[in-house]
Amino acid sequence: MGSPRLAALLLSLPLLLIGLAVSARVACPCLRSWTSHCLLAYRVDKRFAGLQWGWFPLLVRKSKSPPKFEDYWRHRTPASFQRKLLGSPSLSEESHRISIPSSAISHRGQRTKRAQPSAAEGREHLPEAGSQKCGGPEFSFDLLPEVQAVRVTIPAGPKASVRLCYQWALECEDLSSPFDTQKIVSGGHTVDLPYEFLLPCMCIEASYLQEDTVRRKKCPFQSWPEAYGSDFWQSIRFTDYSQHNQMVMALTLRCPLKLEASLCWRQDPLTPCETLPNATAQESEGWYILENVDLHPQLCFKFSFENSSHVECPHQSGSLPSWTVSMDTQAQQLTLHFSSRTYATFSAAWSDPGLGPDTPMPPVYSISQTQGSVPVTLDLIIPFLRQENCILVWRSDVHFAWKHVLCPDVSHRHLGLLILALLALTALVGVVLVLLGRRLLPGSGRTRPVLLLHAADSEAQRRLVGALAELLRTALGGGRDVIVDLWEGTHVARIGPLPWLWAARERVAREQGTVLLLWNCAGPSTACSGDPQAASLRTLLCAAPRPLLLAYFSRLCAKGDIPRPLRALPRYRLLRDLPRLLRALDAQPATLASSWSHLGAKRCLKNRLEQCHLLELEAAKDDYQGSTNSPCGFSCL
């Protein structure tokens, strides 16, 4: 291989010959297939001084497939240079002359030859003089967006080949498969060409079927607003290369357009992305780079071209963010728990409600992660300011950072206070209800007393009455009070029998108690007796509160000895009817069961019953001896 200067000198000789042939319009069969590319290289050389090595393949490479040629060229040409070529006046002509060679393989190697049509085919496919003069077939088109197709109408005349393509710098690139087909249409007919995306660089190209014919190309969609809509952004492939503190997005375009990109943040997927000031990304060969950024899913790129824009948010592939923060509230302080996998400095401050929820107010609290890529948990303690304020958290070691707004949840504190208040109120209401129940409903709120009335005039009878009172108090249980004058002798002696009886009667009536009248017909007649206590008791029997129960000992009084007015009262024979008497005195079944089932209670009741039985025998014997000396009269024992 020679030096570059020698190669350039040798290759400049064919260029000189081609230029002379073209200027002199000398037909050169061996150079005819190079004509279009030589002119192209010549124009490029006029616009850009010098001819680089990357452009020499254009002079000798002749491919029938435009995508191959375009790929070959694009791999060797910067994108900025392609855009300049696209805007060149020499490349924006509506039509240019092409040569379609056919390859033939012989023993001498590969060479190109021109296929000559027969006379009939020549007359059929030969374009008219007017068409040749106009430079290719005239055609019209209609856009069918509902079916994503372009309807092309060829005028009357020979057959033509039509296709859709995306105009790049030096070549009109075929559409991607299956939209990259060329269709043959007869003169005076129409054909529908489907497309994938309606783009501003999409062109319609038509040519006759002969060699060395002219292709007519129309690129009408550059001024159509529809070409910059959703199809335009869907045709772009966005690739995210963001890492560390750098947001990087690579774009693969189908049209050689230069987009503008800026940083924006989106609070919610349904809300617009708000552009941040002074946050324009730098573009280089399709790469958009923004330095010193806190990578966050809500920080996005906003690409715009003309009046159209599109938002592309990196980090949407499900990868975990580089840092997270959580909050824990205590008595008078707030604890922020940071988890970070990168070097970073985090700051936090209370928000200022007067200036806005995103405006921090001093002081600012900061903490740093200095251990690199190892996951580290940091705790930042902040004193409480006011419960209605929110805390702002952000990365302070970068220029562009998204502020997290965290509002302390103090509802659990309010809920706890509310629960305590409700409990206190419930307890207070319960106490009030209990007090009212005891006052207004004494039967259900407290134990009802039993007033035991008797007229015992002997020592044996008094002992029997006392034993019966002890038996009733033990059997009733639950703190039931049995009122009997024998147990309140001092009080009776101080105030007198009658006032004591009236006070006991009022208490029983107030507390809804029961009066138990113990009757006896033995012994001396109380009616004839001068005992003032017995006379007072007989006088008050008619005024005794209800319910009034009558009980009698079988050995001291017979059933027939009860006066007729008292026979209407419930009567209980002691000690045989003691269980019935206890039920009548409103002894609870549970109390009875627990009392009788308990071993100590059984022994106590058994002793009380035996004592009452013995005292009944003793009183009956004593009364029998006394009855021989005085006539029998009715008595309230």
Curated annotation (Swiss-Prot):
* Superkingdom in the source lineage: Eukaryota
- Where the record annotates domain SEFIR, the positions are 447-583
Task: State the signal peptide span.
Answer: 1-23
Q: A single Pfam family, by name?
A: SEFIR
Q: Which GO biological process annotations does it have?
A: inflammatory response
Q: Does the keyword Ribosomal protein apply?
A: no
On the Cytoplasmic side, which residues? 436-637
Give me the segments passing through the membrane: 415-435
| Annotated spans, Disordered | 87-134
Q: Glycosylation positions?
A: 278, 307
On whether Glycoprotein is a keyword of this UniProt record, the answer is yes
MF term (GO), any: interleukin-17 receptor activity
Identify the GO cellular component terms for this protein: cytoplasm; extracellular region; plasma membrane
Q: Which residues lie on this side of the membrane: Extracellular?
A: 24-414
PANTHER family reported in the protein's UniProt record? INTERLEUKIN-17 RECEPTOR (PTHR15583), INTERLEUKIN-17 RECEPTOR E (PTHR15583:SF5)
Biological role stated in the UniProt entry = Specific functional receptor for IL17C, signaling through the NF-kappa-B and MAPK pathways. Requires TRAF3IP2 /ACT1 for signaling. Crucial regulator in innate immunity to bacterial pathogens, such as Citrobacter rodentium. Isoform 4 and isoform 5 may be either cytoplasmic inactive or dominant active forms. Isoform 2 and isoform 3 may act as soluble decoy receptors.
- Name of the protein: Interleukin-17 receptor E
Q: Which organism is it from?
A: Mus musculus (Mouse)
